[in-house]
Amino acid sequence: TTFDVCEIDLLDPDDLQPPYNEPVLSGGPCDMAAATHEDAVFDFSNGDQACFKILRTWTVMDWCQMNTQTGGLWSHIQVIKVMNSVAPEIEPIADLDECSFDPQCGGLTLDFEAIAEDDCSGPGALTWKYYIDENNDETFEYTSGQSTGASVEFSRYIPLGDHRIVYTVWHRCGNNTTEEQLVTIRNCKPPSAKCIHGLSTN
């Protein structure tokens, strides 16, 4: 059984419609059957099969037939899969336009952060990577490792010029979102006059 529901609490038998909420039992007027269940939840890292899967083990006991020697106890595993096609959303990231006053025409070390929200995964189930394209020439000079959380934060030295940072986040269902941030570092140090010793003018 596959559902497009992300909250495990909404998959409780009391919240499901027949025939998914409990076993369908048939018996005689003298039967006294009762059903109980136990869940085991499994996450999938790539989301190809499902966001997560619940193996719900139903146990049915007939008190009229219950005997440790002869039976009266039956079990069945119900497989519940959760799929989701909605990718996480990255909050808008402002482009940066910064000034460097370094006398040697150096750049700046800046702090970066991207934040995402998702309707199907908690913060710990979001995975991030980011890529740095120096000079914005479609070539990535740096690719980060993977990190998890509701946000990704890092500090990085950025040289003078126009650059691009690409953030990618995905959740346990395998859907991903990409957001770009443009970064411009300008040389804002004004020119300074220098005296040349031994030079005179009339």
Model-derived regions: residue spans:
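Proline-threonine-serine-rich low-complexity tracts
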Residues: 1-202
